[in-house]
Amino acid sequence: MSLSEYLREFAEIFEEAAQELTSIFELPPDLLKDITEEDVGTDDSCNKKFLEVQKQKEDEEDEEILKGVDLTQQDSVREKIHEIQSMSQLSEKRKALLMQKMLMSGYLKYRRTHKKESDENQLSSSDLEKTYYDKEQEILGCSHYMRNCKVQCFDCHEWYTCRHCHNDACDHVLERPAVENMLCMICSKVQPAAQYCKYCKNCMGRYYCNKCKLWDDDPNKSSYHCDDCGICRIGRGLGDDYFHCKTCGLCLPISVFNTHRCIERSTDCNCPICGEYMFNSRERVIFLSCSHPLHQRCHEEYIRTNYRCPTCYKTIINVNSLFRILDMEIERQPMPYPYNTWISTIRCNDCNSRCDTKYHFLGHKCNSCHSYNTCISSIYKPLDHPQVSIPRLATAEDAGMRRLMGHSWDNSDEDFNIFGIHSFI
C-alpha cells in the first residue's frame, strides 16, 4: 500500500468515527465545527511528522545501500549501479534516486560543508591579513588600488582586496556589480558593501561607486561613473573634461569633441599589440591619427621598430626625414639591368591610391602623396611580357625603411593628432 492510499484510508476511518461521535452526543453545530478544524490541524501535523520519519528511514536505508562505494574508481561505481538495478524490492523511481544520490554524494558533501562555513561566517588568517598599497607608509590596499577594505566574490565567496587580485589567483572573473559584502581591514568586521564601515565609522575610500562596487582612496585621482559605458573611469566627469560618444561607445576628451572620427564600438576589441581587452582595461588607451586604439604603453614600445598602424597600416608617426633619405638612396643606387625595366603597380596604405612606378629594391614611392608606405600589387617585366601578380609582398616595400629605422625622426604626436583616454579604473 502506498503512502497516499494509507493516508486516504486513515482519513475515511477518522471521518466515520467523527460521525458516530456526533450522532451519540448530538454536539452543537458551532462546537462541532471548532473540533473538526482542530482535528484537521492535528491530522496535518501528524502527517508531516510521519513523512519526516519516513524520509529519515529512507535516508538511513540509502546510506546502508551506498556504503563502500568509491566514486574515484569507475569499477566500484559500475558495480554499485548493477547492484541497485538488481534490487527487485525497490521501485524504478527509488532506484533512479539512489543512483542520482550516489553520483552527487561528493558534491552534496561539499555543499553542506561550504554552507556550514558560510553560515558561521568563519574567516581564515589570510582573510584577516592586511594588505598594503605602500607598506612603508602603511597605506592599505593592493598594487592596484588604495582602499581600506576587501571584497567577497559572489561566486566563490573568497576575500580579495580587489577584482584584479582575485582574477590573478582564480580561474573565474569577479563581477564587481554582484559584490554584496566587504571586510573592513581596520576593524576586521564583515558587513554589506558601503563607503563607510558601520562598526568603526572609517572611510573605505574617498571615491566609492555603489553600482560598480569600486573603492579608491587615492587623493590624487579623480573618478566618475558613466552610465552609458556602465563602468567607472578616471577624470573629473562628463561635461567637465570628458563626453560620451554614442557611436564610439566610450568617453572621450572634450578637446576632440568636433575633431575625432567615430568608429562604432572602437574599444570593444583587444589591443592589437598585447591582446588585452581595451574597453575595461586599466591601461591608458590612446587613439592614433587613423582613429584606431591601442594601449599607450604598447604604442611607445611598438613605434621603436615600426611606423605603421598595426590595424590599417597607415603611417602613425612623422617619417618625412626617412622618406627624404630614401629618395636620395634610390637616386644614388639605380637598379641594374634587367630590373631597371620593370614597372611595379603599387597601392598606397596612406592615401589608398594605386599607381605605377619604377621597380626598386629599397621601396616604391606613391605618386599621389609621396609616401613610401606602399605595397606591391603586381610587377610588369617587359622582357617576359606576362604580368606577375603578387598578392602580398611583405619585404620588398619595407627593405629601405628597415635599413633606416635606426635613424632618428620627428615623432611629434601633435602632427598626427594622437589623443588618449583613461579607461576602466
Swiss-Prot record:
Binding site for Zn(2+) 3: C184, C187, C197, C200
Record carries keyword Electron transport: no
UniProt name for this protein: Uncharacterized RING finger protein C2F3.16
SMART domains, A to Z: RING (SM00184)
Zn-finger region bounds: RING-type: 271-313
Superkingdom as given in the UniProt entry: Eukaryota
Zinc finger boundaries on the chain: CHY-type: 135-202
Any one Pfam family match given in the protein's UniProt record, by short name: zf-CHY
Residues bound to Zn(2+) 1: C142, H144, C162, C165
Binding site for Zn(2+) 5: C226, C229, H244, C251
Keywords recorded for this protein, A-Z: Metal-binding, Zinc, Zinc-finger
Zinc finger (CTCHY-type): 204-270
GO biological process, one term: ubiquitin-dependent protein catabolic process
Molecular function terms, GO-annotated: ubiquitin protein ligase activity; zinc ion binding
Positions contributing to Zn(2+) 2 binding: C153, C156, H166, H172
InterPro entries: RCHY1_zinc-ribbon, Znf_CHY, Znf_CHY_sf, Znf_CTCHY, Znf_CTCHY_sf, Znf_RING, Znf_RING/FYVE/PHD
Any single Gene Ontology cellular-component annotation: nucleus
Chain sites annotated for binding Zn(2+) 6: C245, C248, H260, C262
Residues at which Zn(2+) 4 binds: C209, C212, H225, C232
